Amino acid sequence: GNAVGETASVTADGTGWEGWNRRMMSFVSHINRQDWTETYGLNVVVEGTRAPLSTTEIGSYMSRLPKDTSETRKNIIRYALQSVGKVPYYWGGKASAQNYTGNNFGSVTLPDHKGRILKGLDCSGWVNWVYWSVTGTHLPYEGTEGLRTLGRQVRRQDLKPGDIVVITGSTPHVIMFLGFTSNGQIQCVHE
């Protein structure tokens, strides 16, 4: 699923279990440790969708944007943050339509290379979908390599909120730049 920096799997109480009591947490942990194939004959795939960000969390991220951030960039970032936890990660997944309607996110589909079965988006598909949904313009490339050739390289200090960052190497990835943390680490929104 989508994530914001390192905080995506942590809810307001700091544990990732907001609203759960110890008995329920223990029960869920027990069930997750079971071998479902051996015990029940079921092949269970753990999906990577996280809890959506709260309105307060989204507001907090938005309030940290530089004052000169354009309305379009603000809308792109807000939409990206609002999608956290709502779109499953699915390798090779691309959007069929702008916004949520027509994409059937979360419906069962053929397994991807890691066995994920819920329809969703991969990192480059997610970035393209966010931009398409907000601006009405479908980026000319949907894959990581295509997005790399689409843009131009900028220096780290010249990154602006909403910029697409393509990470190359043996495990390529696409993220949306949000800002820098107080210790200079990149904070991003990603699939």
Q: Where would I find each of the regions flagged by the language model?
A:
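...with weaker cross-activation on analogous glycine-rich loops/strands in unrelated enzymes
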Residues: 128, 132-191
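Generic hydrophobic, helix-prone segments enriched in Leu/Val/Ile
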Residues: 1-2, 80, 89, 147, ...
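N-terminal capping segments
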Residues: 30-124, 132-137
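Intrinsically disordered, low-complexity, compositionally biased regions/tails
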Residues: 9, 45, 52, 63, ...
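Cationic-aromatic interfacial patches
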Residues: 1-21
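Alpha-solenoid helical-repeat scaffold
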Residues: 25-26
